[in-house]
Curated annotation (Swiss-Prot):
Impact reported for residue 41 to A: No effect on transcriptional activity
Species for this entry: Homo sapiens (Human)
DNA-binding region location: 125-200
Impact after mutating residue 42 to A: 4-fold increase in transcriptional activity
Biased composition (Low complexity): 57-70
Protein name listed in UniProt: Estrogen-related receptor gamma
Keyword field: Acetylation, Activator, DNA-binding, Isopeptide bond, Metal-binding, Nucleus, Phosphoprotein, Receptor, Transcription, Transcription regulation, Ubl conjugation, Zinc, Zinc-finger
Encoding gene per record: ESRRG
Length: 458
């Protein structure tokens, strides 16, 4: 296999990342020597990221075979990580021997806000925030499809009231959007569709000849006591991060192996390794991230990966009591934490869960905080500090804009969210040290990517 030279800080051991950066598609996984010439390509569609994660679905398998723990030149060699999904190679484009980045000097300018807009505008498909169908444009302040636009308009113009036959929590998708009108309308309002954008005097066939008589006392549109402040539509970067959010990954613990500390730690290490592959692919879809130098991208990822992993565990655990949801099929309570020797670490993570639960963390805030945690990395090996700072500013402004539009009652909410990041980093440091100690003991097999990311953090 040909070697690949990357311009990266010498203090990091990066041979495995080099292999991942130039990984081929399923048809041809050999690394071509041309990979050493990195040229920027246009950003991939978030759909490729979503589709690609299906490689790690419950029906898949994790390759945990092979020898473990041989020492060579002072570095511990681990197992091969699971194959990288072909449609979204790490930090690069798709297809065999596709160079990572295309020279976009003619289309991308230096201002990160403009870069973000370029990346968003280059997306081939914008999705409806209500049902997930392809959006035809921005309607009533939100990216939405023609069907949801028409539904919202009919509801407001007809002043129609719906009732949910279930628990007001029906899932609204392209296929099921007609199954519950009440939940569909609530979803329209939740994503930011503006009632004020619908003209009440306009009906099929033109304007009404006579003005509609409205009882101001009973009308929610005219009664000042019932009028709610109009929420702004989502910030477009937040909307983009929602679309780019990867699908679930499952732990798939071996049911034939009895529970023990070794089984628990092996399951978590394998899960973390597969999540790392997805995180690196996800980072590429953060507006402005791919415009950083390759070295700075790797530095940010190597510094913030554990924070991103822990934030995911925290968000999945918000609806649970004193349990951590590492994956939907792997939930740890206090007894299981003791068995795995993770009680102190899990208690620290539960403190984060408690904090975010009290703040009623929303998915939009979760995906934005993940991106901010990556950009706010404490790495000392950043080459272009100004470019990274501008990326941080863009993401901070996106969070502030979202909070200003969705939580007008709490003007300090964005600041409160950012104030949780130091505790997240502190918990991340504790987790890295714990798993590094496990690595030194040599009792649990670890994949190469997970090993090298651990070593980069210590």
């Amino acid at each position: 296999m040909d070697s690949v030279e990357l311009c990266l800080p010498e203090s990091f051991s990066l041979h495995y990342e080099e292999e991942l950066l130039c990984r081929m598609s399923n048809k041809d996984r050999h690394i071509d020597s041309s990979c050493s010439s990195f040229i920027k390509t246009e950003p991939s569609s978030p759909a490729s990221l979503t589709d690609s994660v299906n490689h790690h679905s419950p029906g898949g398998s994790s390759d945990a075979s092979g020898s473990y723990s041989s020492t060579m030149n002072g570095h511990q060699n681990g197992l091969d990580s699971p194959p990288l999904y072909p449609s979204a190679p790490i930090l690069g484009g798709s297809g065999p021997v596709r160079k990572l980045y295309d020279d976009c000097s003619s289309t991308i300018v230096e201002d990160p806000q403009t870069k973000c807009e370029y990346m968003l505008n280059s997306m081939p498909k914008r999705l409806c925030l209500v049902c997930g169908d392809i959006a035809s444009g921005y309607h009533y302040g939100v990216a939405s499809c023609e069907a949801c636009k028409a539904f919202f308009k009919r509801t407001i113009q007809g002043n129609i009231e719906y009732s949910c036959p279930a628990t007001n929590e029906c899932e609204i998708t392209k296929r099921r959007r007609k199954s519950c009108q009440a939940c569909r309308f609530m979803k329209c309002l939740k994503v930011g569709m503006l009632k004020e954008g619908v003209r009440l005097d306009r009906v099929r066939g033109g304007r009404q000849k006579y003005k509609r008589r409205i009882d101001a006392e009973n009308s929610p549109y005219l009664n000042p006591q019932l009028v709610q402040p109009a929420k702004k539509p989502y910030n477009k970067i937040v909307s983009h991060l929602l679309v780019a959010e990867p699908e679930k990954i499952y732990a798939m613990p071996d049911p034939t192996v009895p529970d023990s500390d070794i089984k628990a730690l092996t399951t978590l290490c394998d899960l973390a390794d597969r999540e790392l592959v997805v995180i690196i692919g996800w980072a590429k879809h953060i507006p402005g991230f791919s415009t950083l130098s390759l070295a700075d991208q790797m530095s940010l990822l190597q510094s913030a990966w554990m924070e991103i992993l822990i934030l995911g565990v925290v968000y999945r655990s918000l609806s649970f009591e004193d349990e951590l949801v590492y994956a939907d099929d792997y939930i740890m309570d206090e007894d299981q934490s003791k068995l795995a020797g993770l009680l102190d670490l899990n208690n620290a993570i539960l403190q984060l869960v408690k904090k975010y639960k009290s703040m009623k963390l929303e998915k939009e805030e979760f995906v934005t905080l993940k991106a901010i945690a990556l950009a706010n990395s404490d790495s000392m090996h950043i080459e272009d500090v100004e470019a990274v700072q501008k990326l941080q500013d863009v993401l901070h402004e996106a969070l502030q804009d979202y909070e200003a539009g969705q939580h007008m009652e709490d003007p300090r909410r964005a600041g409160k969210m950012l104030m949780t990041l130091p505790l997240l980093r502190q918990t991340s440091t504790k987790a890295v040290q714990h798993f590094y100690n496990i690595k030194l003991e040599g009792k649990v097999p670890m994949h190469k990517l997970f090993l090298e990311m651990l070593e980069a953090k210590v």
